[in-house]
């Protein structure tokens, strides 16, 4: 089954798995999803992920979710820019999530990165989603 919005699909799978207290969740593999997961891992929101190759040639990403005292580390994950309504922000207008306690994940000309990395690199871009 093809998805029209792979980022929303990834976010929904993570949110649903954490509501059910799953330790792992899998999603179809792609470079964009892997780059988003790299950011989430670097920021400490997931334990990690692995690429699983199937004999049919398709790949899946198996994500290890992270919990602290039995509660999900990701309290809130919300899509900002959607295919029907794109949201772009310059470096001066990058949103702060809960006064800096959360992050915004952006797609910039220099790749997918967290908001504080985009500020350091002095680039803006499309605000994909926020995590708290």
UniProtKB/Swiss-Prot annotation:
Gene Ontology annotations of biological process type: translation
- List UniProt keywords, sorted A-Z: Ribonucleoprotein, Ribosomal protein, RNA-binding, rRNA-binding
Concerning PTM, the database record says: A modified and unmodified form exist; the nature of the modification(s) is unknown.
Query: Which cysteine pairs are joined by S-S bonds?
Result: none
> Matching NCBIfam families, A to Z?
PRK00136.1
How does it associate, per the subunit comment? Part of the 30S ribosomal subunit. Contacts proteins S5 and S12.
Query: What is the name of the protein in this document?
Result: Small ribosomal subunit protein uS8
Q: Which organism is it from?
A: Rhodopseudomonas palustris (strain ATCC BAA-98 / CGA009)
- Recorded name of the encoding gene: rpsH
């Amino acid at each position: 089954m093809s998805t029209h919005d792979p980022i929303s699909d990834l976010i929904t799978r993570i949110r649903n798995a954490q509501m059910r207290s799953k330790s792992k969740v899998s999603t179809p593999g792609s470079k964009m999803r892997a780059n988003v997961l790299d950011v989430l891992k670097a920021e400490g929101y997931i334990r990690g992920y692995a690429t699983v190759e199937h004999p049919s040639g398709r790949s899946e990403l198996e994500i290890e979710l992270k919990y602290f005292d039995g509660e999900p580390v990701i309290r809130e994950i919300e899509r900002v820019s959607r295919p029907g309504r794109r949201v772009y922000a310059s470096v001066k207008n990058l949103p702060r999530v809960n006064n800096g306690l959360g992050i915004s994940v952006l797609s910039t000309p220099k790749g997918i990165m967290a908001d504080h990395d985009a500020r350091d690199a002095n680039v803006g871009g499309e605000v994909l989603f926020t995590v708290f």
